[in-house]
C-alpha cells in the first residue's frame, strides 16, 4: 500500500511538470516529424520501418533526461534524506519514481502511435505483436532508467544532471542510428554503431514489428553492457545511500 501511495504521488507530480511533459510527449513527436521530413522523401516507408526508433525516443527522453533530473533534484535538496528519516527506504522510493515514468512512457508511446496513424497512415500492428513489443520495450528501458539513477545521484544539481543526460541521450541517438539512418553511417562510426548495445536492442525491437533486423543482436555483448550498468548503479547507490 505504501508503494502504491508513493507511486501515485510521483505520477501526479510528473503531469504537473511542464519540462517533463515537453521531454516525454512533445520532444519525441518533434523528432518524429523532423526526421520523417528529412529522411522520409529518400527512404520509402520511413515511418513503418522506423516506428521502433520513434517510440524509443520517448523512452530515452523520459528515462535519461526527465528521470535523472528528478532524482538529482531530490538528491540535491536532501528530500531522500527526509524520506529516510520518516522510515521510507530510499531505493523503495526511487523504484516508485521509475515505475511512474514507465506509465508515462506507455502513454507517450500510445500518443506517438496515434499521431503516426493519422499523420502518416501508419497501420497498427496486431494486438499480440504490440503486447510483445511493449514487454520488450519496458525490459530494454531498464538499463536507461539505471543510467538515469546514476546520473541523478552523482550530479551536484539538476542543471548538471540535465546537461549530462542530454549529451548521453543525443550520443545514443547518433550511435544507434536513431538520428541518422545506419545505412548513411560509414567507417569507424558505423563500426561503433553496429557494436553499440542500444543499436542491437533497437534492431530486436524493429524485428518484432517489421520482421527485419538492422544488425544481428549480439546477446552476449548486450548482457555484458547491461551487467556493467547494473553493477555501476549498485556501486553508486551504495555510495550515495
Predicted features by range, described:
Residues 33-41, 155-195:
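Transmembrane helix segments
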Residues 35-43, 68, 116-125, 155-156, ...:
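Short helix-capping/hinge motifs at transmembrane helix termini and TM-loop junctions
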Residues 30, 47-119:
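Hydrophobic alpha-helical transmembrane segments of multi-pass membrane transport proteins
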Residues 2-8, 180-220:
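Short hydrophobic, aromatic-rich alpha-helical segments embedded in or entering the lipid bilayer
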Residues 34-36, 108, 200-241:
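Alpha-helical transmembrane segments of multi-pass membrane transporters/translocases
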